Design a protein with these regions (language model features):
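Extended alpha-helical scaffolding segments used for macromolecular assembly and cargo binding
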Residues: 20-21, 28, 111-190, 194
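C-terminal boundary/linker of central alpha/beta nucleotide-binding cores
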Residues: 11-103, 107-122
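Amphipathic alpha-helical segments of tetratricopeptide repeats
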Residues: 148-149, 192-200, 235-250, 286-297, ...
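TPR-repeat structural position
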Residues: 137, 181, 225-227, 278, ...
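Amphipathic helix/helix-loop-helix segment enriched in hydrophobic residues with interspersed Lys/Arg
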Residues: 1-2, 43
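Conserved alpha-helical positions within TPR/SEL1-like repeat arrays
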Residues: 166-177, 206-223, 256-274, 300-318, ...
């Protein structure tokens, strides 16, 4: 209490000198990221900050901001590329503490902050990915995270509805595309909680289906056990999507609503492919493709066909139908590149997944070219410890290992594990990379170091699985192969596999 009183004393005189409109604006800003509030965000749609402030009265907004800057309640960022403001964190805390004592004002300010942010951010359309919106999402993502924190940390509950949940769902989608899973999952979990609280028993809503879908896919990276839960969640998503379409009058479903159902079928099918249930995977991917063909073609729905071809390619790869898998992977990459351009993250993902099939076909140099291209794109767009970059480096190191270029292989494999558990790289992926490096070190007779990495990798699997390896493995080399296959199968299929049904026609090292 003494701390709160001290903070209030610092700012009270200045706050009391503000007119009501300017104070309302400051309360809204308190829910946003204090380090960088874009002025473009404030000049959004009419009536988003108070009853009198509108985009048509830009001059009035300028006057209010000037007043706040003059009183040192805000300051301009001079280092940012676009006009933005900064608020002292102690002032932000004071404003939020004051709002916690004024429930009606707090709710109004929060709703307006949500509306400002929602209006500034383009809605994520799963029909395609529009690359021109990426910069906008990246610029304003801190505001979404600030709203999430304010909502969760408020002393009193804040009401939130579908608009905020939809914003969280879209943010989760963007973060997943950038493989920022640790940030995305709490956002989506909060969105799910908000939507469920709004729905009556038996009710469905598209926002809930979207959130469930993203949570299922995100959780699939963590462990085999989580992928089993993801399969159950995706079955619910299919039911939700089918229920939404059934509830609509005939021929009134939008293109996106129908595509959302196809996505749900496809994502569930992909999890079946991950667990090597290829018959179910084949049925689900075919069902989604048939739906897309009824809605458009490769020209009108290029992105969705690209995604679908890549999913079917993974199934064909696992079925041993390599010629089909290679053709589908190539078409997937080309469609994605023509839709989004060669430097988009989704294009890079299609290129990496194409490389998995090339490895299975024994075209190691072709795979290496694809992986190097994708690494260049990902390194340009993502941080060094991003799991997409680390996974690409694992595969580059693995291809070099297959080519007996051990020095290059070691370099990339060490880079793949250098951040360890501190990155978003899933535990199964880290263990696989550690064991691949151990195999390389064993080849070089660097026993002590090899054992260290081998033990680290084996610590990620259960005693029962380790016992199975030693029972089935007749001889040291056989045990190494079985261990690599066990660790490889624990990795989510989207991150690639090179053993079991996904070994393909390649011969030589496991």
């Amino acid at each position: 209490m003494q701390y709160e009183r001290t903070l209030s004393t610092v700012w009270d005189d200045l706050l009391e000198s503000l007119d009501s409109e300017t104070r309302d604006l400051l309360d809204v800003l308190a829910f946003l990221n204090p380090d960088c509030i874009s002025e473009d965000l404030l000049r959004g749609k009419p009536d988003t900050t108070s009853g009198n402030l509108t985009v048509n009265n830009s001059f009035r907004l300028t006057v209010m901001l000037s007043s706040l800057i003059r009183r040192n309640l805000l300051e301009r960022n001079i280092t940012t590329t676009c006009p933005s403001l900064r608020m002292h964190r102690l002032l932000q805390l004071t404003l939020l503490l004051n709002l916690d004592r004024r429930q009606e004002k707090r709710q109004e300010a929060f709703d307006n902050a949500v509306r400002l942010t929602r209006d500034a951010l383009p809605r994520r359309d799963m029909t395609s990915r529009l690359p021109q919106f990426d910069a906008i999402w990246k610029q304003h993502m801190p505001q979404v995270l600030s709203l999430q924190a304010a909502f969760e940390q408020s002393n009193l509950s804040i009401a939130a509805g579908f608009e905020f949940a939809s914003l969280l769902a879209d943010a989760g989608s963007f973060l997943w595309e950038h493989r920022l899973n640790r940030i995305a999952i709490p956002l989506l979990t909060l969105g799910e909680k908000i939507v469920v609280a709004q729905l009556q028993e038996g009710e469905t809503h598209s926002v809930l289906a979207s959130i469930e879908n993203f949570l299922a896919v995100l959780s699939a990276y963590d462990s085999v056990e989580d992928r089993r839960l993801a399969m159950q969640r995706l079955k619910r998503v299919v039911q939700l999507r089918e229920g939404i379409l059934r509830s609509l009058p005939d021929k009134t479903a939008t293109l996106e609503q129908q595509i959302d159902l196809g996505r749900a079928w496809n994502d569930l099918a992909y999890i079946h492919a991950d667990t090597e249930e290829f018959e179910e995977a084949d049925q689900g991917t075919a069902k989604a493709l048939e739906l897309y063909k009824s809605l458009g073609d490769e020209r009108s729905l290029r992105f969705r066909f690209a995604i679908q071809y890549q999913s079917i390619a993974a199934v064909r790869f696992g079925q041993g139908r390599l010629t089909e898998a290679l053709d589908l992977s190539r078409r997937s990459y080309e469609l994605c590149k023509s839709e989004l351009g060669p430097r988009h993250l989704e294009t890079a993902r299609m290129e990496v997944e194409w490389s998995y099939v090339l490895i299975g076909a024994g075209d190691l140099h072709g795979a290496l070219d694809r992986l190097m291209d994708a690494l260049a794109v990902r390194s340009e767009r993502l941080e060094r410890d991003n799991p997409a970059i680390l996974n690409t480096k694992y595969w580059i190191g693995t291809v070099y290992h297959y080519l007996d270029q051990l020095e290059e292989a070691e370099e990339y494999l060490r880079q793949a594990i250098e951040f360890g558990a501190d990155s978003d790289l899933g535990k199964p992926d880290l263990a696989r990379s550690q064991y691949r490096l151990a195999l390389l070190l064993y080849e070089q007779r660097r026993w002590k170091e090899a054992v260290t990495f081998e033990e680290a990798a084996l610590s990620s699997i259960s005693d029962e699985e380790q016992a199975t390896i030693f029972c089935d493995g007749d001889g040291r080399d056989k045990r190494k192969d079985i261990t690599m296959e066990v660790l490889d199968r624990r990795v989510f299929l989207q991150n690639g596999r090179s053993t079991g049904p996904f070994r393909g026609e390649r011969t030589g090292k496991v």
